[in-house]
Swiss-Prot record:
<dbReference type="Pfam" id="PF01008">
    <property type="entry name" value="IF-2B"/>
</dbReference>
<feature type="binding site">
    <location>
        <position position="205"/>
    </location>
    <ligand>
        <name>substrate</name>
    </ligand>
</feature>
<comment type="pathway">
    <text>Amino-acid biosynthesis; L-methionine biosynthesis via salvage pathway; L-methionine from S-methyl-5-thio-alpha-D-ribose 1-phosphate: step 1/6.</text>
</comment>
<keyword id="KW-0486">Methionine biosynthesis</keyword>
<keyword id="KW-0028">Amino-acid biosynthesis</keyword>
<dbReference type="InterPro" id="IPR042529">
    <property type="entry name" value="IF_2B-like_C"/>
</dbReference>
<comment type="function">
    <text>Catalyzes the interconversion of methylthioribose-1-phosphate (MTR-1-P) into methylthioribulose-1-phosphate (MTRu-1-P).</text>
</comment>
<feature type="binding site">
    <location>
        <begin position="54"/>
        <end position="56"/>
    </location>
    <ligand>
        <name>substrate</name>
    </ligand>
</feature>
<feature type="active site" description="Proton donor">
    <location>
        <position position="246"/>
    </location>
</feature>
<dbReference type="InterPro" id="IPR037171">
    <property type="entry name" value="NagB/RpiA_transferase-like"/>
</dbReference>
<keyword id="KW-0413">Isomerase</keyword>
<feature type="site" description="Transition state stabilizer">
    <location>
        <position position="166"/>
    </location>
</feature>
<feature type="binding site">
    <location>
        <begin position="256"/>
        <end position="257"/>
    </location>
    <ligand>
        <name>substrate</name>
    </ligand>
</feature>
<dbReference type="InterPro" id="IPR005251">
    <property type="entry name" value="IF-M1Pi"/>
</dbReference>
<dbReference type="GO" id="GO:0019509">
    <property type="term" value="P:L-methionine salvage from methylthioadenosine"/>
</dbReference>
<protein>
    <recommendedName>
        <fullName>Methylthioribose-1-phosphate isomerase</fullName>
        <ecNumber>5.3.1.23</ecNumber>
    </recommendedName>
</protein>
<dbReference type="InterPro" id="IPR000649">
    <property type="entry name" value="IF-2B-related"/>
</dbReference>
Length: 358
């Protein structure tokens, strides 16, 4: 399966070369393929904030490379450069507060810096660590793809009709994808009849990105309005809802793109299995439950302006980016460390105690 997944890979969103970070601008896909070059931590932070790059794993990887760029500039300035680099890292951390992968990656970079020995080049060490973060995410996605496909086969061996939300493919990660990685693997094994992709308002990641990725790989995909999801479960034989995650708490609650919670509620009502796919770096064992997650809100103009015209001077907007799905609505969380079925605090702790990959 690994070789088949590698052969099928067609999309990437992050490239590190020539001492610079290149990001595919996901705001203009699928109409244009525009790459931006970044040479400063400030530039990378702005790219994360403005969603040039998005998806929790991709954000973490980009932040790690941003830390390298910050270190290069601060070291070149001379003197006591570490406090200035910490300011750069804080700027990166503030760019998207919900995605725990961002903080995980920056903490790894800090830890690596603390382990640099006298006489060694800290910049070389940081660059190696950022590349390792990128490659390990790619490897984790390959592992999760196989584990998720195996889980589908174990529960339902017939052809599957899957519903997914937002974008969780190669564009959102270091390669292959999380939820879309599982869908890719299941398709290669002949288990996918059709994928329904929520359009995912207001940024339309489903219609702009997910449908584009799936169509590029020849996976049958139908785009649907977010509000059609429950109707699809009732009338189109949906067998699985498969989504990613931006943060998973110690009890198995999942923060993901706004609209995920209502999918889980509808799936429970219709007897549709609900799978979350995310690397272990998304799991925050320091956070007890989803009640503690700070939910990012974006500019209300994303909802209030239609065709460049404001809908009403007195109208206000509520525009949260994420919601929290309680663990008791989730059938399985798939990580590179293994699978947790019917997640709870004890099962999550057991998963995270494992020191090796599955």
């Amino acid at each position: 399966m690994r070789d088949r997944l590698l052969a099928a890979e067609k999309v990437k969103a992050i490239d590190w070369r020539d001492d610079a970070l290149y990001l595919l601008d996901q705001r203009v896909l699928p109409f244009e393929e525009v790459w931006h070059r970044y040479t400063t931590a400030e530039g990378v932070a702005e790219a994360i904030r403005t969603m040039v790059v998005r998806g929790a794993p991709a954000i973490g990887i980009s932040a790690a490379y941003g830390a390298v760029l910050g270190a290069r500039a601060r070291i070149a300035e001379g003197g006591d450069w570490y406090p200035a680099l910490e300011e750069d890292m804080q700027l990166l951390a503030d760019s998207r507060p919900t995605a725990v992968n961002l903080f995980w990656a920056l903490n790894r970079m800090r830890d690596r810096l603390m382990r640099v020995k006298d006489g060694d080049d800290p910049l070389v060490a940081l660059e190696a660590e950022s590349v390792a973060i990128h490659l390990s995410d790619r490897e984790a996605n390959l592992t999760m793809a196989q584990l998720g496909a195996d889980l589908i086969r174990r529960h339902q061996g017939n052809l599957q009709t899957v519903l997914t939300h937002c974008n969780t493919g190669a564009l959102a990660t270091g390669g292959f994808g999380t939820a879309l990685g599982v869908i890719r693997a299941a398709h290669l094994e002949g288990m996918i009849e059709r994928v329904y992709a929520d359009e995912t308002r207001p940024w339309l990641q489903g219609s702009r990105l997910t449908a584009w990725e799936l169509a590029n790989e020849g996976i049958p995909v139908t785009l649907n309005a977010d509000s059609a999801a429950a109707h699809l479960m009732r009338t189109k034989g949906i067998t699985w809802v498969i989504v990613g995650a931006d943060r998973i708490t110690a009890n198995g609650d999942v923060a993901n793109k706004i609209g995920t919670y209502q999918l889980a509620v509808a799936a429970m009502h219709h007897g549709v299995r609900f799978m979350v796919v995310a690397p272990s770096s998304t799991i925050d064992m320091e956070m007890a439950s989803g009640d503690d997650i700070i939910i990012e809100e974006r500019d209300g103009r994303e909802l209030l302006e239609v065709g460049g015209q404001r809908v009403g001077a007195q109208v206000e907007a509520f525009n949260p980016v994420f919601d929290v799905t309680p663990a008791d609505l989730i059938d399985a969380i798939v990580t590179e460390k293994g699978i947790v079925e019917r997640p709870d605090t004890a099962r999550m702790a057991q998963l995270m105690s494992r020191k090796h990959l599955h």
